[in-house]
């Protein structure tokens, strides 16, 4: 069995690499996908549609272009991991989790205990809540167990 796993959320740490390395170390047959993680490139995704003097419209265009990628990859995924960091509010990650719930797409949340209360509804719809990337890898190992 193989899986396509979309890695959603926080872009300021190497959590995606940790999961990918862990999966590789266990020879798991997983294709990982993700949003564009270069913050400047993501913010500029809509610039090809024309220059905007108002930052709202620049952000609006970029959000729509980014959504093409995000929605497509979430829909193609067998499973989604949604990471919430402690430094920034990841509204986009919460939106991705809600989209997964609406699609009945299984997802795992990954965040510290300090975020349990603010994310209680997001966690309630998730199939699992992990606090470490190692726990995520163990879940992936179990799911792919023969």
Language-model region placement:
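Conserved catalytic or regulatory cores that recognize and/or transform ribose-phosphate-containing ligands
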Residues: 1-146
């Amino acid at each position: 069995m193989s899986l396509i796993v979309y890695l959603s959320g926080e872009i300021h740490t190497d959590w995606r690499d940790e999961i990918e390395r862990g999966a590789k170390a266990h020879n798991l047959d997983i294709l990982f996908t993700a949003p564009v993680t270069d913050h400047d490139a993501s913010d500029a995704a809509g610039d090809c549609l024309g220059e905007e003097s108002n930052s709202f419209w620049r952000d609006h265009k970029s959000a729509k272009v980014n959504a093409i990628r995000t929605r497509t990859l979430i829909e193609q995924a067998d499973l989604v991991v949604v990471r919430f960091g402690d430094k920034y509010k990841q509204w986009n990650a919460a939106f991705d989790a809600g989209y997964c719930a609406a699609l009945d797409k299984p997802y795992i949340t990954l965040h510290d205990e300090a975020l349990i209360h603010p994310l209680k509804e997001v966690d309630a719809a998730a199939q699992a809540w992990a606090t470490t990337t190692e726990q995520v890898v163990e879940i992936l190992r179990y799911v792919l167990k023969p």
